Amino acid sequence: MTDAVKKIAKLVVDLHGEKNTQNIIEVAKAGGKESAEAVLFKKLTDAIIKDMTAMINHGDSKEKMQFTSTEQDLPMAEDTTLTNNKLFWFSVVVGIVLFVTAINYLLDKVCWIKAARKIAITCFLISVCWNYINIYEKTMAKRYMVIRQGIPGGCMERGADWSTVLRTMFKTLMITHSDSNDECLQYAKSIIVEPLFEVTPTTALATTISDLILVPINLAAKSCNNVFRTVFEGVPVFMIPILVFLLVYISTLCIISTKRYTISVPFLLELKPCLVEPPPMVPISVRNETCNVVHKKPVALRRGLCYNKLFRNKKY
């Protein structure tokens, strides 16, 4: 028996769990036509396949256990997220109720015009600070990007060759430069100038005022654009001028009719001031009677009025 056969038999014993190596060798010798090495090699491969299938089955069972555990944990995670969402919305509702209660109490104690004025001034000051921080952060981002790109290629450095010097001189003499187009100056400013001093409070104030005026106009213009787009959607191109004329005509008539003008349309339009009829004249007898009734006063009251007039007109 060779050493190879003994080693294979030992491996088979280790894999199959057999207790006696000699029994395996005898079984291998009694294999008939096949040699002992071939029989033992088959047994070895069978043992390896058996162990591999067992390992695979064990891994599948572990994955199934992990999957079932994750499936069991999922409802718990969903429950925690639901509870967190409920707490968040509950806190939001409580905050809104407290805010409305405080506003109602303040409006009962203070004049609502003064309260609205104070709230508007406070919001304006907060917006100024907000815009200042926003502009400062944007300036910092621009400065970071300029520094990150490095020194521009056209800028002269110490130890530059003659080609760089001549190119820079040619650009300086032949090409007009401005401060906004000068890359070297922009790079130097981004390194030296602090953004805190570049962004001034007046800039934030002007930005806030312009936003206060222009942002509502911008939103109104966008809304009008959407309205006209929906009105003219699906209308042929040659019908659009007619529709615009009709809209302008109808809106003009509505505006003018509120100003007490008469509108006649023999040739599409004619404007005249509205003729207002005067009220009917009251008969003279009725007017005299009403005047007598109105001006008839008690004697004591008339005397008092006379005395008051005398003392008022008398000069001492």
Swiss-Prot record:
It is a multi-pass membrane protein. The keyword Transcription regulation does not apply. Its main location: host cell. It comes from the Viruses. The chain crosses the membrane at residues 87-107, 116-135, 236-256. It is found in: Host membrane. One of its GO terms (cellular component) is membrane. One of its GO terms (molecular function) is chloride channel activity. Keywords: Host membrane, Membrane, Transmembrane, Transmembrane helix. InterPro entries: Chloride_chnl_CLIC-like. Disulfide bonds: none annotated. The keyword Membrane applies. This is Putative transmembrane protein ORF57. It comes from Ostreid herpesvirus 1 (isolate France) (OsHV-1).
